[in-house]
A protein has these predicted regions:
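Asp-based phosphoryl-transfer active-site loop
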Residues: 2-19, 227
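Short loop/turn microsegments at loop-to-beta-strand junctions
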Residues: 2-4, 62-63, 217
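Conserved Rossmann-like nucleotide-cofactor binding loop
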Residues: 13, 47, 222
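Short active-site oxyanion
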Residues: 36-40, 64, 150, 212-213, ...
Length: 228
């Protein structure tokens, strides 16, 4: 088996319940890299927040590249390269939010390692605390002046079926977006061209590595296409 790269999701896979990487895992990563195998992170988190957490997770200096925001970002530490692909327009984000405005949920957009939300509640507070990320409550009419990589809907896990059901009624003839349950409490909207596998394929191609030469680990629906 010609494995030239290993990639791993963050939450529920790479991190323990204490929000660190186990010492045995770190040792395995270092051993693989010593043999010339690249180690990357493929996550729904944005690339900035991953970079900001390397030290606290205990993997500083162990990462070669990050595929962030579900596949729309590539942050390559070897090539010192960053690129962002496929965003959602401000008008589309507003329309999506309006579609769920009467429901028990909140919305958030992660930008430059910070979670931005239109209101303060337990949903955004718990998410920020769990991920160890700063959050800010802002006026989204003012905030949404540029495209963003994705919009996240936060809700109670028991309420997720209702969010998914409502999503089936969302239609827009001018814009396209795809949506996916990424954790028990997160429902995410992204450009339909975005997926972890497409982002990973592009990141690997920068090093002339094929998908068949990559071993991937994950635990959620958006990790499945990486493992096919």
């Amino acid at each position: 088996m010609d494995i030239r790269a290993i990639v791993c999701d963050v939450d529920g896979t790479l991190l323990t319940s204490k929000q660190v990487v186990d010492e045995k895992t770190v040792a395995s990563i270092k051993k693989a890299r010593s043999k010339g195998i690249l180690f990357g992170i493929c996550t729904g988190r944005d690339a900035d927040s991953v970079r900001n957490h390397m030290k606290s997770w205990g993997i500083e200096g162990c990462i070669d590249f990050v595929v962030g925001s579900g596949g729309s970002e590539i942050d390559d530490y070897i090539l010192n390269l960053y690129q962002e692909n496929h965003t959602l327009s401000p008008d589309l984000i507003k329309e999506i939010m309006n579609h769920y405005k009467d429901m028990d949920c909140n919305f958030t957009i992660c930008h430059e390692g910070i979670l931005y939300a239109p209101k303060d509640d337990d949903y955004i507070r718990n998410m920020a605390e769990g991920d160890g990320i700063e959050y800010r409550v802002v006026d989204f009419d003012t905030f949404l002046t540029r495209p963003y990589r994705k919009l996240m809907i936060i809700c109670n896990p028991s309420y997720m079926p209702q969010i998914v059901e409502r999503s089936q009624a969302f239609k827009n003839k001018d814009y396209k977006a795809s949506a996916l349950v990424t954790t028990s409490f997160l429902y995410e909207y992204m450009d339909p061209h975005v997926s972890k596998s497409s982002g990973l394929k592009e990141a690997l191609s920068l090093h002339n590595i094929s998908m068949s030469q990559c071993m991937a680990f994950g635990d959620e629906d958006n990790d499945i296409d990486n493992m096919k």
